[in-house]
Amino acid sequence: MTTKRKPYVRPMTSTWWKKLPFYRFYMVREGTAVPTVWFSIVLIYGLFALKHGADSWAGYIGFLQNPVVVILNLITLAAALLHTKTWFELAPKAANVIIKGEKMGPEPVIKGLWVVTAVVTVVILFVALFW
C-alpha cells in the first residue's frame, strides 16, 4: 500500500560540517590523506630515479631541494604527525588494559606509543646515517 503523504525532509546545506568543531577537525584529519598521496608519489618517483642510474638520482635530489617541494614535504610531515596523534589517542579506547582489576587510563598507552615511535625513528636514522 502506498501513501500520498510527503515525508518531511530536513534541509541540509553542503556546509553543515563547518558549524561544529568536532566535524571540522574530523574533516581536517581525513584531509591528511591528500599530503600522504603526495609523499607516496615522491617516493615512487625516487624509486624510479634510483632504478635509472646516477644522473636520474641526482635529478631527484635536485627536485627534493626545490623550496616548494621542501614546503610541501613539511606540510606532509605535519599532516602525518596529526594523523599519528589522533590514532594514538584512539588506541586506548580500542584496547581495554586491566591491571590489578582496574582499567588503565589512556595516558600511559599514548605515551608508550610515542616512546616506541621515537625509539624506532632514532634507530632507523642511526642505521641510515651511520651503518
Curated annotation (Swiss-Prot):
Belongs to the FrdC family. CDD domains: QFR_TypeD_subunitC. One of its GO terms (molecular function) is succinate dehydrogenase activity. Keywords: Cell inner membrane, Cell membrane, Membrane, Transmembrane, Transmembrane helix. Part of an enzyme complex containing four subunits: a flavoprotein (FrdA), an iron-sulfur protein (FrdB), and two hydrophobic anchor proteins (FrdC and FrdD). InterPro entries: Fumarate_red_C, SQR/QFR_C/D. The chain crosses the membrane at residues 30-50, 61-81, 110-130. Pfam families: Fumarate_red_C. Two distinct, membrane-bound, FAD-containing enzymes are responsible for the catalysis of fumarate and succinate interconversion; fumarate reductase is used in anaerobic growth, and succinate dehydrogenase is used in aerobic growth. Anchors the catalytic components of the fumarate reductase complex to the cell inner membrane, binds quinones. It is a multi-pass membrane protein. It comes from Klebsiella pneumoniae subsp. pneumoniae (strain ATCC 700721 / MGH 78578). It is found in: Cell inner membrane. Gene3D superfamilies: Fumarate reductase/succinate dehydrogenase, transmembrane subunit (1.20.1300.10). One of its GO terms (cellular component) is fumarate reductase complex. This is Fumarate reductase subunit C.
